[in-house]
């Protein structure tokens, strides 16, 4: 009996201990905790390292935070944020460090690789600063989930990743410069037979697509991978496939199956924009009854919407932009579940009445079509609309009040139409972008726009907006682009417009009626790239605080009344490419320091129509390093780049080829120097000949003297040369005939002498290029150069014809000559008969008489 009690007691104790042990969390092994702490200490915490995080599957934004900050020795690593342990053994089996703000090098011998029992590892959305992906990732033999996406890894994806045969999810997508050799791509698909999700977006694979995909695949993301060849039809018959992304592979040919796909019932998202769609959209598309998202932009589709697409009545996101589709927009009422519709850059026409039927819309982009008429004013059901883009159509009338009343509006773009009327007050408090430029809107800027907390883009240029710029604009502390140019604004520029906004990149207040001084203080650390204030009535000096604009690429203060000397300190803005101070009251000599880096990046320098004096700024001209290179690129023209040129094109007055014009975009190869209409004197520096990339040179209307430098022959891409209205002397260098790109030449009103060079380009210039130079000779002038054939003028030709065609004068001369000859002849005959003169003289006389008679007969025949 005692034995039974003893056994029972021991069993009871064991069960209690077992229950107690199962209820307590296991402490992770000390060596694994140490490995994690060592891993933590390899990186710093930087919020910018995870500044943009989102769920790759749903694209929903995720808030980043430093998970590793909570890691310390005083607690079990199983309780640390992002660390998950096996409930039985306490081993670390999962590590979730996505969006953890980690920054630093990821070393190949990282202590992380000591966690050999890991099954899930997520390091996405950090910044590992161009680290290589270590082959040791292939040693995690138990891994089922591996996510290294968007963490700034670079280089080749190691073949050892192909050893992870248990993987269900593999995400290695990044635009930092990852690549996967074609053989390893094929090996990966062959070995990872358990894959459910494969995401290699933006990895450079440069291969055809093998057909040996895992039959378990639900998600295949291969967008932007440089794939080519023909997509295997087997991909469409993967029975579990839910999401297929192949976008931005222009060398990839996609030929959809003509029969029903095995994935028809499961496929929910299909992204094939910017690929080569072969043939027409087949009827088999009609069976994609579960399809919610279809992206087929830039696929060279043309004509009406393919009929099979009209059967996709469950579609929620539809993108058919950048094609050649046409037809009335009203047909889209059939898609009642649509939340996002993009038909941008097609040929759709008609009105917007269909908006009354699509009440679920959240995002609508119909920009760059042929839509006409006003926007209907009786629409009331679009309370969920967040983004509305109708730019570059033929819409007119006033902007209806329901647009201003949208409670959730975030982005609005109605630019490049002919809308009129006033801009009403906005109800939405969540606006981030308002673009109404290039319309006929009038009135004042509504206060509701100036009180937005998240507004980043405000583009209202090229309208008839009037009034003062309210100081309330300084409340827009998140503003990046402010474009109010080409309106009727007046008054002064609010001092705080730049001072309070640390994010402002583009400031354009050009072509208004603004007055006063530029009294804004440009603070240290600002990120301004464009300042355009030209075409106003601004006075005073160029603010010295502009030297703090270290990122400035364009400064245009032209056509104002600024009264200052040359702001030489602007040369320390090493990003500056375009500097225009034209048509002001700037004066005095242009002085420069010995710093050879000043203005080295300038591509356009326009100081014309001022009062500058003294010699030409030889040292500054010698510093223009960018102009000392010739752009030999071929293909499409490249423009001076700007990260926001999708929204904004600066308007700058360019003087070239003898004309002024407003340039919206400036070619990267456009190198211009315009110092005309000043009081510069002295010689033209020969150092200008080193600026071999120069396209336009205008030094006209100064007091320059001396000779044209022979070094100008080096300006091999020069298209326009204007040296007119100076005191330049000497000859035109014959070497200039080698300038084969020269289209415009003006050397008029100087003191040039000698022969005009001959050549393909010089032979095309008229008198106006040389007038006012009395000492010049040669084509096209009437004065000849030595050794040239006589150039017969039209007047001389007329005179010759007149003399040749006068029968009276010619006939009288012949008669007089014949009469004299007859008298002399008779006398000679008499002497010959009387004196028996030699016979040879008689024969000569007869021959002479025959010649005269023959000429008379010919003259009679002519008339």
Curated annotation (Swiss-Prot):
Residues 834-863 are cytoplasmic. The chain crosses the membrane at residues 813-833. Induction: Induced by C.fulvum AVR9 elicitor protein in a temperature-sensitive manner. Repressed by sly-miR6022. It is found in: Cell membrane. One of its GO terms (biological process) is defense response to fungus. Involved in plant defense. Confers resistance to the fungal pathogen C.fulvum through recognition of the AVR9 elicitor protein. Interacts with thioredoxin-like protein CITRX. The extracellular leucine-rich repeats are required for the specificity of the elicitor protein recognition. Important sequence determinants of Cf-9 function are located in LRRs 10 to 18. This is Receptor-like protein Cf-9. The lineage of its organism: Eukaryota, Viridiplantae, Streptophyta, Embryophyta, Tracheophyta.
């Amino acid at each position: 009996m005692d034995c039974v009690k003893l056994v029972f007691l021991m069993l009871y104790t064991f069960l209690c201990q077992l229950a107690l042990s199962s209820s307590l969390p296991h402490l992770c092994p000390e060596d694994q905790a140490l490995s994690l702490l060592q891993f933590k200490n390899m990186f710093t915490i930087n919020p910018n390292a995870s500044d943009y995080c989102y769920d790759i599957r749903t694209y929903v934004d995720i808030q980043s935070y430093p998970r590793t900050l909570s890691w310390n020795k005083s607690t079990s690593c199983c309780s640390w944020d992002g660390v998950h342990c096996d409930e039985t053994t306490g081993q670390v089996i999962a590590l979730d460090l996505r969006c953890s703000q980690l920054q630093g090098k990821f070393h190949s011998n990282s202590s992380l690789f000591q966690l050999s029992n890991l099954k899930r590892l997520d390091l996405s959305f950090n910044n590992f600063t161009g680290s290589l992906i270590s082959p040791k990732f292939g040693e995690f033999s138990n891994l089922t989930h591996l996510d290294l996406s968007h963490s700034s890894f670079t280089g080749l994806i190691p073949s050892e990743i192909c050893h992870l045969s248990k993987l269900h999810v593999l995400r290695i997508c990044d635009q930092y410069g990852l690549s996967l050799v074609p053989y390893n791509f094929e090996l990966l698909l062959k070995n990872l037979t358990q894959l459910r999700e494969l995401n290699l977006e933006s990895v450079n694979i440069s291969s055809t697509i093998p057909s040996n995909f895992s039959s378990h695949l639900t998600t295949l993301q291969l967008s932007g991978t440089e794939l080519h060849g023909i997509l295997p039809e087997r991909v469409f018959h993967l029975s579990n496939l839910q999401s297929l992304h192949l976008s931005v592979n222009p060398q990839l040919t996609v030929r959809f199956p003509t029969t029903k796909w095995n994935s028809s019932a499961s496929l929910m998202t299909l992204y094939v924009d910017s690929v080569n769609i072969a043939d027409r959209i087949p009827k088999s598309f009609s069976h994609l009854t579960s399809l919610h998202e279809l992206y087929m932009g830039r696929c060279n589709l043309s004509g009406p919407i393919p009929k099979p697409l009209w059967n996709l009545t469950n579609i929620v996101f539809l993108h058919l932009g950048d094609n050649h589709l046409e037809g009335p927009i009203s047909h889209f009422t059939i898609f009642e579940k649509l939340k996002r519709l993009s038909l941008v850059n097609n040929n759709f026409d008609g009105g917007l009445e269909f908006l009354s039927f699509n009440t679920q819309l959240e995002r609508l982009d119909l920009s760059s079509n042929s839509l006409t008429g006003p926007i209907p004013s009786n629409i009331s059901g679009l309370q969920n609309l967040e983004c509305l883009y109708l730019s570059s159509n033929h819409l007119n009338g006033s902007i209806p009040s329901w647009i201003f009343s949208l409670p959730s509006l975030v982005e609005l773009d109605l630019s490049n139409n002919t809308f009129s009327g006033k801009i009403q007050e906005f109800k939405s408090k969540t606006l981030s972008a308002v673009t109404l430029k290039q319309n006929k809107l009038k009135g004042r800027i509504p206060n509701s726009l100036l009180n937005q907390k998240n507004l980043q883009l405000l583009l209202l240029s090229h309208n008839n907006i009037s009034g003062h710029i309210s100081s309330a604009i300084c409340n827009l502390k998140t503003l990046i682009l402010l474009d109010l140019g080409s309106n009727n604004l007046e008054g002064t520029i609010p001092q705080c417009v730049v001072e309070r906004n640390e994010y402002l990149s583009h400031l354009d207040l050009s072509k208004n009626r603004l007055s006063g001084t530029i009294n804004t203080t440009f603070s240290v650390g600002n990120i301004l790239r464009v300042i355009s204030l030209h075409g106003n009535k601004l006075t005073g000096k160029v603010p010295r605080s502009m030297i703090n604009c270290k990122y400035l690429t364009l400064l245009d203060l032209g056509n104002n009344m600024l009264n200052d000397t040359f702001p030489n300190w602007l040369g320390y803005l090493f990003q500056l490419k375009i500097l225009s101070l034209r048509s002001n009251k700037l004066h005095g000599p242009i002085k420069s320091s010995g710093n050879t880096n000043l203005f080295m990046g300038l591509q356009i320098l326009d100081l014309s129509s001022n009062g500058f004096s003294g010699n030409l700024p030889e040292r500054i001209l010698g510093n223009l390093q960018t102009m000392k290179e010739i752009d030999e690129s071929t293909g499409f023209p490249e423009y001076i780049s700007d990260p926001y040129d999708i929204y904004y094109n600066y308007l700058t007055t360019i003087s070239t080829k003898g004309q002024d014009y407003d340039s919206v975009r400036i070619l990267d190869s456009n190198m211009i120097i315009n110092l005309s209409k000043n009081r510069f004197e002295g010689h033209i520096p020969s150092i200008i000949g080193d600026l071999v990339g120069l396209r336009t040179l205008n030094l006209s209307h100064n007091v320059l003297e001396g000779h044209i430098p022979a070094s100008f022959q080096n300006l091999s891409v020069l298209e326009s040369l204007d040296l007119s209205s100076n005191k330049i002397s000497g000859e035109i260098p014959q070497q200039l005939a080698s300038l084969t790109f020269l289209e415009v030449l003006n050397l008029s009103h100087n003191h040039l002498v000698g022969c005009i060079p001959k050549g393909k380009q010089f032979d095309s210039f008229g008198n106006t290029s040389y007038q006012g130079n009395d000492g010049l000779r040669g084509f096209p002038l009437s004065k000849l150069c030595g050794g040239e054939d006589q150039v017969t003028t039209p007047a001389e030709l007329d005179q010759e014809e007149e003399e040749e065609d006068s029968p009276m004068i010619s006939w009288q001369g012949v008669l007089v000559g014949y009469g004299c000859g007859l008298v002399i002849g008779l006398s000679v005959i008499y002497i010959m008969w009387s004196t028996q003169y030699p016979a040879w003289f008689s024969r000569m006389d007869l021959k002479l008489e025959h010649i005269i008679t023959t000429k008379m007969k010919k003259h009679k025949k002519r008339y």
